[in-house]
């Protein structure tokens, strides 16, 4: 290979490397598996230009296969009016008739992914060399990043990733086993610096300067799962003001594999094939969006949903300016689309109740430390850093009792870990099964029948039921049974400020009910590595229980209320907040800390419990339609949904956020009584009460962005499940402890959602449409926020979501280019 001194023409390679790394979306670990926009690195491009980029790099863009759209036209989901409007929006000169004629013509050209050198080898002998390279890198990454799953740890994990790989390659004999010679020697000749190695690799491969960016992006996407994990490590480091070079090092490893294969390849035909592939890419032509049939059809699909949504909103009752009488109760749920159904059901069984929508962390930016642990878990949107650390503690206990129970839990966890290590060790694998296998027969039978949980819930491991019932978050500093260098709790001087933030952004500043429920949400499943993806995204993939309970504790705190009153927020003395958890698998709501309520509110609590039970039944019956039990009696539906929480063979315990398509920030009266089919994120917002529009700014920069991430994660998982989804859930195997999953026993780390989260085996349950954001607020204020925040501006101006404004009279306007807002008819 050439020496660094000879690569003067690659002196600006650092910018290319950084550009490729920025294109990769982070992948959060399984312990808080939150949805991420897989195209977040392309948001600086208009949506349909990003489609062109992806088709050039991966061979697959941002649309579904043509037959999908043909089916939507055939069943009436896309109508003539939608096609007409789509052609206008895409600036196409075709008529609908011409479009349908072109639809019948299959393109003669095929989108070919941007090649890596292993593709040239595959083209020559049809052996899966690209798969071999991915397998070698994936196994290396699993060992290097392992978080405790491996019995033996890699010896070079303390070295930078690229330098550790150089040492690993010295011992890796697998290339020789598949007939590759000289790999180890070529790897040994690589430079020690990752950036220098990348430059040398590009020189070795003769990648033209104008293709460097595309090649580096393609190289990272060829190992996209592990690239996402490395991007996550960088993301976490940046939140702390630090740096992490794992992604750059992974890129160096990937391109060096290509360079090594090229250097050791003696076949002239393969080298010629490689240069031909590069030449083809340089002369490649991509369809314009106006001529891209599937882009027009995708736009028509989205217009069809907008037509239905806007019609429903226009037909809804208008918000009233009259003073609302005191509600019989108030219940705040997360903005999650699953909350839309239970909120609608609760308002049906109790018309006098007021429901609210707010992000499920309930405004408390914290990390939460489980009892007996010193490892905090984020309970806030992943785009924020937690200013507070709150500990779970044993209620009504002395310090000595707390320490005893914490020590007992720690001992149980250590014993469980040691027992698991013994069962999986090399010396006991066979003898253990032979000696004790029969003892596990009752549990195996119970687990198989779905009568028992296969394993305890992670939050309950090492705890007996009595201790579990006594655990709760503490507002004040707590030892939690463990020492901590970081102060815990929320300082008393800051509580009124936090309370004000919660109430104002929830839209709850007057007319307080006697009883106010803050209901977080979570899911209950077993044998589901990606189970945290069903929990609350606003709580970083945790349940909303801790967030709801700490918010309630704070809002009931007398000192906090005195501080709130000084800020002009007077909560009546007979108003009490109470925390709950909505189980989205069973639609049952558990209420916590009821012993804190005075006896004067016993009837209020009993009535609320009954309303929640009735609403849960209505919600289950509505959801049963998609779960195949719609014709069953209510008690049968309930039993089936409870079974799903324990059944280790259930691949579709619930549909989670499948179908999500809209984000609405408006007074509840705007959507109350409207069946939004569990497809809309609902955030309560009244701009008339938002002095300075700080709440509007928060909504557009946080919940709206998070909803876009969720929406795009589902979108990407459906239109390109191979790269941005996780394949078949049945084949998932956990790797690295809690890093992620492989499909089967090898290949790349998988990202996104499994097919079972999108498809019921017969038809698609999710519909790939970009998020439709509807906000009831002045256009000028929204434009001001768009202009101040580049992230929001990129999402809106580049078409990664649709933005609509709804006026006080119910008129709807769509935001288009040049800051124009034409009225929707």
UniProtKB/Swiss-Prot annotation:
<comment type="subunit">
    <text>Forms a complex with DabB.</text>
</comment>
<keyword id="KW-0862">Zinc</keyword>
<feature type="binding site">
    <location>
        <position position="521"/>
    </location>
    <ligand>
        <name>Zn(2+)</name>
    </ligand>
</feature>
<dbReference type="GO" id="GO:0008270">
    <property type="term" value="F:zinc ion binding"/>
</dbReference>
<dbReference type="InterPro" id="IPR018752">
    <property type="entry name" value="DabA"/>
</dbReference>
<protein>
    <recommendedName>
        <fullName>Probable inorganic carbon transporter subunit DabA</fullName>
    </recommendedName>
</protein>
<feature type="binding site">
    <location>
        <position position="536"/>
    </location>
    <ligand>
        <name>Zn(2+)</name>
    </ligand>
</feature>
<keyword id="KW-0997">Cell inner membrane</keyword>
<feature type="binding site">
    <location>
        <position position="334"/>
    </location>
    <ligand>
        <name>Zn(2+)</name>
    </ligand>
</feature>
<keyword id="KW-1003">Cell membrane</keyword>
<keyword id="KW-0813">Transport</keyword>
<comment type="function">
    <text>Part of an energy-coupled inorganic carbon pump.</text>
</comment>
<keyword id="KW-0472">Membrane</keyword>
<keyword id="KW-0479">Metal-binding</keyword>
<dbReference type="GO" id="GO:0005886">
    <property type="term" value="C:plasma membrane"/>
</dbReference>
<feature type="binding site">
    <location>
        <position position="336"/>
    </location>
    <ligand>
        <name>Zn(2+)</name>
    </ligand>
</feature>
<dbReference type="Pfam" id="PF10070">
    <property type="entry name" value="DabA"/>
</dbReference>
<comment type="similarity">
    <text>Belongs to the inorganic carbon transporter (TC 9.A.2) DabA family.</text>
</comment>
């Amino acid at each position: 290979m050439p020496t660094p001194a000879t690569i003067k023409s690659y002196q600006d390679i650092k910018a290319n490397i950084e550009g490729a790394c920025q294109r990769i979306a982070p992948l959060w670990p399984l312990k808080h598996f939150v949805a991420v926009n897989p195209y977040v690195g392309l948001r600086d491009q208009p949506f349909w230009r990003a489609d062109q980029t992806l088709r050039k790099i991966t061979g697959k863009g941002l649309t579904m296969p043509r037959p999908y759209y043909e089916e939507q036209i055939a069943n009436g989901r896309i109508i003539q009016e939608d096609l007409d409007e789509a052609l206008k929006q895409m600036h196409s000169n075709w008529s609908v008739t011409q479009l349908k004629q072109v639809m019948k013509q299959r393109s003669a050209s095929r989108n070919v992914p941007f090649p890596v050198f292993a593709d040239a080898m595959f083209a020559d002998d049809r052996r899966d060399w690209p798969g071999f390279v991915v397998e070698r890198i994936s196994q290396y990454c699993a060992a290097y990043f392992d978080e405790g799953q491996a019995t033996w740890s890699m010896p070079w994990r303390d070295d930078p990733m690229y330098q550790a790989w150089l040492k690993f390659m010295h011992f890796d004999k697998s290339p020789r086993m598949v007939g590759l010679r000289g790999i180890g020697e070529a790897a040994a000749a690589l430079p020690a610096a990752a950036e220098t190695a990348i430059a040398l690799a590009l020189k070795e491969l003769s990648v033209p300067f104008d293709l460097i960016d595309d090649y580096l992006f393609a190289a990272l996407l060829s190992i996209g799962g592990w690239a996402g994990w490395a991007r996550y490590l960088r993301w976490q480091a940046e939140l702390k003001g630090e740096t992490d070079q794992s992604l750059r090092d992974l890129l160096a490893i990937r391109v060096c594999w290509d360079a090594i294969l090229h250097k050791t390849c003696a076949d002239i035909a393969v080298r010629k094939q490689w240069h031909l592939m590069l030449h083809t890419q340089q002369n490649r032509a991509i369809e314009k969006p106006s001529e891209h049939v599937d882009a027009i059809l995708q736009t028509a699909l989205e217009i069809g949903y907008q037509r239905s949504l806007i019609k429903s909103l226009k037909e809804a009752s208008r918000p009233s300016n009259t003073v609302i009488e005191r509600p019989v109760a108030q219940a705040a749920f997360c903005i999650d689309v699953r909350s839309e159904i239970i909120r609608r059901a609760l308002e049906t069984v109790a018309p006098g109740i007021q429901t609210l929508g707010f992000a499920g962390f309930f405004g408390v930016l914290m990390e939460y430390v489980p009892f007996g642990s010193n490892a905090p878990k984020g309970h806030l949107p992943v785009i924020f850093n937690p200013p507070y650390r709150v500990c779970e503690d044993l209620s009504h206990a002395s310090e000595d009792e707390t320490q005893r129970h914490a020590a007992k839990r720690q001992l149980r966890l250590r014993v469980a870990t040691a027992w698991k290590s013994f069962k999986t060790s090399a010396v006991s694998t066979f003898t253990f099964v032979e000696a004790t296998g029969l003892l596990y027969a009752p549990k195996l039978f119970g687990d198989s029948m779905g009568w028992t949980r296969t394993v305890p819930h992670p939050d309950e491991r090492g705890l007996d039921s009595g201790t579990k019932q006594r655990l709760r978050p503490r507002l004040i500093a707590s030892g939690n049974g463990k020492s901590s260098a970081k102060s815990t709790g929320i300082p008393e001087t800051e509580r009124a400020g936090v309370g004000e933030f919660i109430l104002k952004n929830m839209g709850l500043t007057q007319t307080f009910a006697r009883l106010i429920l803050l209901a977080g949400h979570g899911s209950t499943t077993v044998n589901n590595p990606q189970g945290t993806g069903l929990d609350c995204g606003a709580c970083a993939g945790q349940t909303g229980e801790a967030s709801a309970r700490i918010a309630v504790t704070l809002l009931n705190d007398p000192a906090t209320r005195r501080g709130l009153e000084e800020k002009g927020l007077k909560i009546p003395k007979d108003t009490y907040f109470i925390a709950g958890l909505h189980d989205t698998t069973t639609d049952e709501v558990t209420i916590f800390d009821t012993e804190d309520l005075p006896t004067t509110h016993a009837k209020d609590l009993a009535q609320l419990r009954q309303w929640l039970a009735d609403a849960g039944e209505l919600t289950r019956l509505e959801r049963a339609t998609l779960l195949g039990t719609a014709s069953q009696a209510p008690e049968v539906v309930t039993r089936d949904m409870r079974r799903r929480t324990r059944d280790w063979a259930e691949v579709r315990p619930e549909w989670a956020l499948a179908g999500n398509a809209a984000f609405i920030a408006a007074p509840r009266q705007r959507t109350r009584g409207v069946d939004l089919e569990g497809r809309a994120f609902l955030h309560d917002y009244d701009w008339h009460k938002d002095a300075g529009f700080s709440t509007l700014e928060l909504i557009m920069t946080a919940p709206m962005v998070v909803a876009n991430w969720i929406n795009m994660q589902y979108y990407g998982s459906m239109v390109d499940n191979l790269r941005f989804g996780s394949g078949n859930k049945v084949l998932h195997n956990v790797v690295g402890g809690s890093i992620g999953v492989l499909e089967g026993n090898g290949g790349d780390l998988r990202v996104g959602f499994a097919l079972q989260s999108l498809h019921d085996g017969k038809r698609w349950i999710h519909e790939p449409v970009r998020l439709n954001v509807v906000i009831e607020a002045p256009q000028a204020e929204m434009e001001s926020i768009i202009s101040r925040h580049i992230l929001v501006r990129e999402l809106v101006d580049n078409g990664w979501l649709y933005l609509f404004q709804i006026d006080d009279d119910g008129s709807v306007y769509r935001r288009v280019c040049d800051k124009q807002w034409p009225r929707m008819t």
